[in-house]
Amino acid sequence: MTQDDKKTPGQFSRRRFIAGSAVLGGSMMMPGFMNSVWAAGTDAPEKKEIRVGFIPLTDCSSVVMAAVKKFDEKYGIKIIPSKESSWASVRDKLVSGELDAAHVLYGLVYGLQLGVSGPQHDMAMLMSLNNNGQAITLSNQLKQAGVTDAASLKKMVDASAKGTYTFAQTFPTGTHAMWLYYWLANAGIHPFNDVRNVVVPPPQMVVNMKIGNMSGYCVGEPWNQRAIQDDIGFTAATSQEIWPDHPEKILGTTSAWVAANPNAARALTAAVLDASRWIDTSDANRTETAQVVAARAYINTPVATIQGRMLGDYENGLGKKWKDAHSMRFFNDGAVNYPYLSDGMWFLTQHKRWGLLDKDPDYLAVAKKINRIDVYKQAATAVGGINLPSGDMRSSTLMDGKVWDGSNPAEYANSFAMKR
């Protein structure tokens, strides 16, 4: 947990975990016994084979490793990872039922719930997959012109005609769009009025920058490190600089799928949660994970492109190297994975800020509908030894000093000087 989170209502408590272990299932069961009941008894998963979509990004790792390391078998299921080409493809296949669940952008699921990022569908968020590990890359052409950070970019944008520079993100309601907009706005650059912004699928970012289609982009790893290795760009900011330990990808599905497959949803969540804990247990496990997901079937990039930042070893392409205290995390003693209502609500505040929503929704009601805390708690009990927080909100301080704790989302959404 970050320093900001340590004294919040969402603080993790081992005592709370013990008291809350018998969630929504009657009496407490030992993890091994619970798993055998799920696999063979009345709580057996309704589906044995579960197709889970993913985009080639480092943060798909827990889904992939749940299958590769056979955590899925412990819970009576078989996860079939399905590599997808874009977030739009993930969206379409989720709502059509071609995918059972997916490694997906937090904001994509919330956008679907409100009919913003496609036709309205009731959605479900089963768990958070990771914190941190995204970045904003700027082109070497900008570097050669003297741009090395947000302040120097602001000067160049101000000196040019509006729309001269193009920036890419990965989906209109997604996390990368929100990090990019927040970073630009914090520098005084309006993401819609001062520059152009376009949607590009994550694996296509590097090649599009190489041929000059954009001046910058926001995406997940390894595509920021890849730009440095290919000598076409540099890291201007990491997403954890914008919001330390921010929410990012989630395990998402439709509400209808959970209703039809409650035991399978629980088993899937448990398997991915178990894999998340395994990844974060040691640098050796993280290294093994990098070696697995680098393969052609998954991310299809050199291991070195993934491994460094996965271990917290950063370079920015401008000569600076550092050990990042908030590098990508998959578990962090369970703090990563809990479906905090405030995390989902934050994305809605940014959708409102940037005109994707024309009025304030019932922020809390939407989050309670999507974030399936009940399923997560059941899965956490089955896995065993997973700390649960004492509340469903957490407090964080973002790069501009604003504190977000979910307490007054409408006021927060309308408090920004720069908006659309």
Where are these regions (language model features)?
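Short, glycine-/small- and polar/acidic-enriched structural segments
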Residues: 40-199, 208-227, 232-245, 397-411
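N-terminal export leaders
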Residues: 13-30
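Short glycine- and hydrophobic/aromatic-rich loop-to-beta-strand nucleating segment
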Residues: 136-137, 250-253, 257-258
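N-terminal secretory signal peptides
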Residues: 1-12, 31, 38
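Conserved C-terminal helix/tail region of periplasmic/extracytoplasmic solute-binding proteins
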Residues: 345-420
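Extracytoplasmic/secreted proteins, especially bacterial periplasmic and envelope-associated proteins
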Residues: 67, 89, 93, 175-179, ...
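Secondary-structure end/capping motifs
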Residues: 260-372
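Short gly/pro-enriched beta-turn/loop segments at secondary-structure junctions
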Residues: 245-246, 288
